[in-house]
Amino acid sequence: MTLNLAANGTQWYSGERTWTSADAILYALGVGAGAEDPLSELEFTTENTRAVPQQVLPTFAVVVGGKGGGPELGDFDLARLLHAEQSITVHGALPPTATVRSRGRLAGFYDKGADALIVMEGETTDAETGRLLAESRTSLFVRGEGGFGGPRGESEPWRVPDRPADHLVTYQTREDQALLYRLSGDRNPLHSDPWLAARAGFDRPILHGLCTYGFTGRALLHAACGSDPTRFHSMRARFTAPVLPGQALDVHIWDEGDAYLFRTTAGDRIVLDRGVFLTKAT
């Protein structure tokens, strides 16, 4: 079993897709908007509320890119492939409806000793105007595929500030949260099929990592941006543990002046870590 190292640097066109107002609303519901107070986030959960124009959660950027078109990553058991890190940069508020084009690039294979890290980058542009809407960087961890002699890659410094969080936001996920979130495009049966979840070592289907990421993005939007999507610039975090639907998520946010640091916990486990969030000046 080997990595397809020859694919390093490959670029591809992921295709064109259109999203609708309903798609943006469905995503918002999938990451908990309005669940605890149906009147609190109407700008994200409705399109026809009087004097409340529809807006789009910035983390919708993780699902709007095209599907497919990338190179084969290698000949290895996909059960050993894990979503390690995710970052997004949003260039202005996402529109409620749009037709977009997406491109991707395999940015690197990194040798982590016994394991490997694959990094892919993407960008999404408005198909009509060509305006850059969002950029993404996705890191995939492949267990047992290290030792190929490649670069290790740099690790950016990060530490928990030596003080209580400046903001603590708690969201309760629903028992059916994964069933809602999968309607935004990620139909991986690990999040819905009890048989497959058991085969992967879980008592029941787990929540999508990007759903946890979306809940965390909502917390950052409200705590650090005054609920204004135009102030949301970039978000980066590492996935460290799975979440079960129905668990509560605690988002710990520290204001460091030039950036916000964050981590998300579920009970006594850290599920998102090494988070860095940047805002735009108003």
Regions found by a protein language model. Name each.
Residues 1-8, 12, 64, 81-169, ...:
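HotDog/MaoC-like acyl-thioester-processing domains
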Residues 1-99:
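Hydrophobic, proline/glycine-rich low-complexity stretches
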Residues 2-45, 156-212, 219-222:
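A contiguous, surface-exposed recognition patch within enzymatic or periplasmic domains that forms
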Residues 20, 62-68, 139-145, 173-184:
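Phosphate-binding glycine-rich loops and adjacent basic patches that engage nucleotide phosphates
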Residues 26, 43, 58-59, 87, ...:
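Generic structural signal for residues positioned in beta-strands
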Residues 36-37, 126-131, 225-228:
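Short, glycine- and charge-enriched coil/turn segments that flank and shape catalytic ligand pockets
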Residues 42, 55-58, 79-80, 92, ...:
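Flexible, active-site-adjacent loop/turn segments at secondary-structure boundaries
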Residues 195-270:
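Catalytic-pocket segment enriched in acidic/His residues
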